[in-house]
């Protein structure tokens, strides 16, 4: 699918200048397993809030379905975009270790305030409702700020426990991303079963308080493993990576009128090296920076530019991805959720099937499919990251088509006024396919943005991965607002009417399926021409 760039050292590898390599006493699976447990505790906390957020907004806070969905998407988008700032601070100034500690502290404070806000008596007066909403949204966005530093750094910190220059550890690193996803999904599955039940049947304050304790445990466990990690808090004699890359663009712009011959004469050796690499055949305008910049710096700039088409074409997938915690949940709430007399399945619990399918499929993928594919492809990960991402995007389109068909059937049953509503179990296949899709695309995007950026920018690389989901959530929120306004005119019911039996979520799902197909076609075109930055990139 893509050409491989064979010179790993010029862009840097896991053994970067500010990692402390003590291979016999630190790092490896010993440290990586602890990082997985640390993030499992954090994921329990985050999804203990996020999974049922729309039900809290439409319930105790009294928002409409469309407003609540827009608020959830806006917050989720902010959670996904703030890592760009957190990654920048980590890679440029603080380092990943310090950033994780500081952001975890903010995270814990936000969760504590969130739980406190639910204890404020509501509906007693306008002032008390306003106070509750103010504290609630302030704490919610404080959690987002904590996530902004935590999320890009913890995954990179875990992957950095493996040396990419060692063949065995490079394979272990690829496996690490699979098992990190596995652990996260077990944790998310647990919190969706436990927290959502507590929130809807016992107490919202208790349901939001338990995630606070879980995040406190996450920070404690992370600090417990300090002596076993491969890391250093100091940068060793390297310029700010953002300054290096910015300088390449500035020099290329300054020299844009210089003839090629003058550039070659100015630095003949660097120019010959540039021409020797397949990756340098792309973005040749940056070669004009060779007058005053080093080859490695120019290649770093090109590596960053190559990410942009993949980032853009992956956004449609994340728009589709944004529907499972919002409209899928509201869709399930209108269906027959009884499993025994007096016992209802919380609608948000259905999201557990996404995680359950990942938990079931990842061991099969990592232990059976990868070795089988490796025997044919000779790729240490079985298939390339772009092939993995593309498989997941295709499956997400299939899930959305299935969701549209099920919603059409549900609406027909509701409008026929059947005495027994359609069973909620009809939604399970779309959740399962979404889970398998996430296993391919989410892990693939993590590996891709970790491996294809310069080593000193890996926190930012992971943040770029997360920002795709932010863009998807913001665009989803924008689409919902526009479609709601358009379809609510002239006395017509909105596609997102509060009474979903009179709404048309099926039309929205079909629209997303069409957009997904168009985005997938563009993705295939860019992926086919992509040039990998390293030979050992997953």
UniProtKB/Swiss-Prot annotation:
Gene Ontology BP terms: nitrate transmembrane transport
GO terms for MF: dipeptide transmembrane transporter activity; low-affinity nitrate transmembrane transporter activity; tripeptide transmembrane transporter activity
Keyword Transcription set for record: no
Tissue expression per record: Expressed in shoots and roots.
Annotated GO CC locations: plant-type vacuole membrane
Localization in the cell: Membrane
Modified residues (Phosphothreonine): 99
Family classification: Belongs to the major facilitator superfamily. Proton-dependent oligopeptide transporter (POT/PTR) (TC 2.A.17) family.
Protein's UniProt name: Protein NRT1/ PTR FAMILY 5.11
Organism from which the protein derives: Arabidopsis thaliana
Gene: NPF5.11
